[in-house]
Amino acid sequence: MGIHVPSNVPMESTPFKGMEFEADEIACGFYNEHGKKAGFSIKKEYVNKYKKTGVVTSRRFVCAKEGVRGKDKRNQNVKNPRAKTRCGCEARLVIVLNRDSKKYVVSEFIVEHNHYLHLPSTVHMMPSQRKAATTHAIEIDLAHESGLRLKQSYELLSKQVGGYDNLGFTK
């Protein structure tokens, strides 16, 4: 499959070694936005914290296709086995707390992916990009309480916002 490097991402949206963030969640949001523009989904892999204070000292964000799924312990003759979603991708962003400045600094950034990246037209379907707005969730609940089926309320809401890709979530 080869190595795939995002080429359509502006430099100001690309993290780099030594880049600083005020908080770990800001770094997560920045890397998630980078992933959206590049065509991949992210996940939080691990976090290290001070035991006494609970302050995050380091954190790793990885491509959602990082690692490989373990052997399925269920019956081997299942009709619909789960699709393989992970392929051992090494792309990641690691941040470490600088004790002097109290800021999080990028200590490692690997940009290369070992899988194809998503097209801009399908980016909104990736797990880290799907965010249901509170107002949308309330509207779907109200429609369900009014007797509409979930699919019908989803279609109604998608028409209100101008299409499925503007919703930010799937059924």
Enumerate the predicted regions with their spans:
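Short, conserved DNA-binding cores of transcription-related domains
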Residues: M1-P127
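Short, positively charged, Gly/Tyr-enriched micro-motifs
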Residues: L117-K171
